[in-house]
């Protein structure tokens, strides 16, 4: 029974680790959009030309 428990913990850890690495790129893109929104860039129309990702969220 203890061996089964260890196998489940190991499998969960491996899946969690690989999922986290796969989502790192998406986190980077999201943090950029959050930074643009915090600066108020998305409310300024000429900013769309230099930051096309900013206007895409609407």
UniProtKB/Swiss-Prot annotation:
Modified residues (Cysteine amide): 54
Cysteine disulfide partners in this protein: 41-47, 42-54
Cleaved propeptide residues: 17-39
Main subcellular location of this protein, as a coarse class: secreted
Pfam families, per database record: Toxin_8
Family: Belongs to the conotoxin A superfamily.
Protein's name in the database: Alpha-conotoxin AuIB
Native organism: Conus aulicus (Princely cone)
Upper taxonomic lineage: Eukaryota, Metazoa, Spiralia, Lophotrochozoa, Mollusca
């Amino acid at each position: 029974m203890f061996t089964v428990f260890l196998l489940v913990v190991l499998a969960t850890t491996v899946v969690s680790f690989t999922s986290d690495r796969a989502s790192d790129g998406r986190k980077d893109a999201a943090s950029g959009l959050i930074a643009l929104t915090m600066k108020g860039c998305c409310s300024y129309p000429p900013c769309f030309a230099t930051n096309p990702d900013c206007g895409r969220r609407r």
